[in-house]
């Protein structure tokens, strides 16, 4: 175990086995801290599953993995369905019982190829994830990680409906090192896997109790007025200066004025701060990958940097 920031300990374990993919790593950590669900889109072989498994092992969390397909049945996701016959006064009574498993008993679940799930199963699945309940009974799930291949024709993949995609607060794009031309990191991967043993057991670094303690801290973490104003300015800038509207983006009040506050706080905790700072506005990169047009998303660092600079310059002017 460790007395250091528990989330940095989890990051260390991911870094030991996976080179690069910083956006995915930070997204997973923000999801664990905030207990919000995560959507990752990227081609096969970009460490999506491996990173989720590393976090669950290092944090001693019960992990469930399932690869969805066109014939996925709900029972495959929630446990075994037992059907029995019992005699009754009016004849034979047929009863069904669910022996809980899958997402009903896991603390982290990874739902691979979620967009391939049939509509009926997907709707029930998303309702369970949203409510974190099954027949009014709470489930222990901290965060669900849904993955999908890019929706290009060659992957024979259909995109999630925007309303369904919006249920995943954290959204990130995973890219391979080769096509991303990250040649230095590619060489590091080759070196790492040339030297590491074939079998490697991820050590236990964090307990569920520690994660619970930090989640309690999350709600009380201060968001100063200047950070609140910066968030409002961020949304206003996207709409007023970049022409975003209902037809070209998905900027919901729920996501940007409620859920975004949890992500700001989670980002502050990840960086060992006891209150949010203007720099935590960069966490908005992890909720906007599929809510904004690609060309606007690519400018996000610049947009956020400008907003932070304006706030800091205003503060300096007022102090004079």
Q: Can you say where each PLM-predicted feature lies in the sequence?
A:
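Pre-Walker A (pre-P-loop) alpha-helix and adjacent loop at the N terminus of AAA/AAA+ ATPase modules
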Residues: 4-43
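Canonical AAA+ ATPase core
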Residues: 84-89, 108, 113-124, 130-206, ...
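C-terminal engagement/docking regions of AAA+ P-loop ATPases
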Residues: 47, 240-320
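Short loop/turn elements that form and flank the Walker-type P-loop nucleotide-binding site
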Residues: 26, 33-35, 59, 103-105, ...
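Conserved C-terminal "switch" segment of AAA+ ATPases
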Residues: 3, 17-18, 172-246, 273
